Amino acid sequence: ELVRTVNALPNQPFVLALDIPSGLDGRTGLAMPEAIRASATVSFAAAKPGLVLPHAHAWTGALHVRAIGIPLAAQRKAPCSFYALDGRSLEPLGHILPDGFKNSYGHVLVLGGAPGLGGAAHLAARAALRAGAGLVTAAAPGAGMADIKNSWPEIMTLPLGATERRWPAALPAELVELLERCAALVVGPGMGRGADAADFIEALLRQPHRPPTVFDADALVLLAGRQDLLDRIAEHDVLTPHPGEAAALLGCSAAEIQADRQESLARLCGLCRGVVVLKGAASLVGQAQSPTLLCPYDVPQLAVGGSGDVLAGCTGGLLARMLPAVMQSHHAAQQNSTAATDISQPVRLQPAHTLAGQAVALHALAGKSLADIWPLRGNTPSDVADALPRTLSAYAAAPAQAAPRIHTRDRKDDILPWPR
C-alpha cells in the first residue's frame, strides 16, 4: 500500500532506494508485482544483475554502486557471478603491434551465403574486417559468390564448385588446406537449412584441428537435436543464438526463452563446452562453470535484419586477432593464483568467453553510436559494421594514446566489475 501511495503522488518526491528498490526482483529486474519508482538507487559493492537491465531503469532511476568495506578475503571467497559488458571491457583490445602485418591479426574464414542468401555472409565478412582481422575469406557454393563479395575487393572468396548451388557433403581439399591457415571460422550466416548444409556442418565438425568457430544463424538450427555434434563443440567455440534459435536448440518456444533468460542461458551452456551468447536486449554471455557477462544496453539501432551476422563476424574477427594473446595472458594468470586482488578481479574467464563478451559490448556500443545520426532507426547492419572501428578507438585507446572520453551514462560506471 505504501509503494502504491508514493508512486501515485502527483508531485513526485525524490526517492532514494538503498540496495534495491522495494518490490523489485534483483535477478530479473521486474516488479513483484509492484515496486517503488526510485529517483536514484545506491547499491553496495556490486549491483544485482536485475538492476542494470534496461527495463529496470523505470524503477531504479540513476544507479550508483559504492564500496562499503567488504574485506578482501570475503570478496575472494564469494566472487561476483555477473560482470558488466560496458566500455571498460573494450580497453584490453587497444593493443596494436608496432611491427605487425596482416597475418599478425589473423585470417577469418566465413562459411555461409548460399545462393540468394549471400548478403548475410557479406555482413559477417565485412564485420570481421572492421573488427580488425588481417585477412578474410568467404567460402560458399559458387553460384552465390557475387552476392557475398558485393564489390568489396578486400573480401577474398573460395567458390565451392564454380556453378554449384549446394554445399558439398565432404570438405574439398582446398577448403581443408585453408582451414589449416585460418585463425577463426564463422559458420552459418545465410547458409540455408537444407540437408546439404546439415551434411556440410557435420563434416566440418568432424574435421581435426578445426580453428575456433563462431556458430550462428542456420548453423545453430542445424545443430538442434544433434547432441553428437554439440559434443564436438570446443571451449574456444562460440554459439550466438537469438531467442528463436535458442528455442530450437532447447526444444521449447521463444516465449519460454524470454520468460527467464538467465535460466535459458544456463540450459544452453549445458548443451556443450563452448561459449553461448544469448542475443537480445541486455545480451547474456555464458559458459559452463563460469560467471555470466551481461550487456546492460537496449539498442533500437540493432533491431534490423543482419545485425546478428555483424555480431558473428565481429566475434570471429576478435577471436582471430586476439585469441593467442588472451590465451597467453590467461595461462600467466593461472600460474599466479593470487592475481585476484578485489571484487573486480575474482575470476579469470576462458579466453573465448572474454572475447565473445567484448564482441557483444563492441557491437552494442557501435549500435548506440548510430543514434546520433539515426535516432529513430533507419540505419542498416552495414552501418553497424562500419561503426565498429570508430567505436573501438573511442573505448580502447592504445596506451600511447590519450585516454578515451567516455560518458558515464554510456559506461554505467561501477555497476558490475569487469574481470581483468
Q: What residue spans do the PLM features occupy?
A:
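Internal gly/pro-rich beta-alpha loop/helix module
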Residues: 1-79
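Short acidic catalytic loops
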Residues: 15-24, 185-188, 214-216
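Small-residue (G/A/S/T)-rich helix-start motifs and N-terminal tracts that mark the onset
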Residues: 38-40, 51-214, 221-238, 243-420
